[in-house]
């Protein structure tokens, strides 16, 4: 509902939220529940394959169409998505990914901008939808330069009221649907 009916092929969505709120778990659930016959690649730079696999098993999300990759090199991630015939690529998180040609460390402003721009180009040319997980600052904004939010098609925030067991996904930018939608 927040995305206006689903993830659009070739689109790039950025989802941010506080540490530990469940961004990785939410997107693992999205990938595992996508249409049968569609191939998804979940690329993690934050956890080992064993950790992600364990969470997927705990949630009952094992799916033959879901591939896992522990990798921070953007070129390797993009090649793996192409090779897998993925229709959806999830990058967890943009702050851990780097493009080797830049020489800056992962999380640096130049890396964040270049990696996001390359993911956008990749999505638009391949038709593969990309969902990027982004960390948030203490103030609640997605960490990194504001240009990240301008480059992507949708910006979502995953949040919770203090003391509540419920989580909310809120769209603040969506080129394919309404904003200020909640789910």
Where are these regions (language model features)?
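Short gly/ser/thr-rich secondary-structure transition/capping motifs
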Residues: 1, 68-72, 138
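Residue-level signature of catalytic and energy-coupling elements of molecular machines
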Residues: 2, 15, 52, 92, ...
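Phosphate-binding P-loop
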Residues: 2-10
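Short polybasic/polar patches that bind polyanions
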Residues: 3, 57, 124
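Conserved inter-motif catalytic segment of the P-loop NTP-binding fold
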Residues: 10, 18-21, 25-121
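Phosphate-binding/switch region of NTP-binding enzymes
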Residues: 120-183
């Amino acid at each position: 509902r927040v995305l206006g009916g689903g993830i659009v092929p070739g689109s790039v969505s950025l989802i941010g939220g506080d540490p530990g709120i469940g961004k990785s778990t939410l997107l693992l659930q999205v990938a595992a529940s996508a249409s049968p016959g569609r191939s998804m690649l979940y690329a993690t730079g934050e956890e080992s394959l064993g950790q992600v696999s364990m969470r997927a098993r705990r949630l009952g999300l094992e799916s033959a169409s879901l591939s896992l990759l522990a990798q921070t090199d953007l070129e390797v991630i993009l090649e793996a998505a192409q090779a897998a015939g993925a229709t959806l690529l999830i990058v967890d998180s943009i702050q851990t990914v780097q493009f080797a040609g830049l020489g800056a460390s992962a999380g640096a402003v130049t890396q964040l901008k270049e990696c996001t721009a390359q993911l956008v180009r990749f999505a638009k040319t391949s038709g593969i939808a990309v969902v990027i997980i982004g960390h948030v600052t203490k103030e609640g904004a997605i960490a990194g330069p504001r240009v990240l939010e301008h480059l992507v098609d949708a910006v979502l925030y995953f949040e919770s009221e203090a003391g509540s067991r419920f989580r909310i996904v809120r769209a603040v930018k969506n080129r394919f649907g309404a904003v200020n939608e909640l789910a």
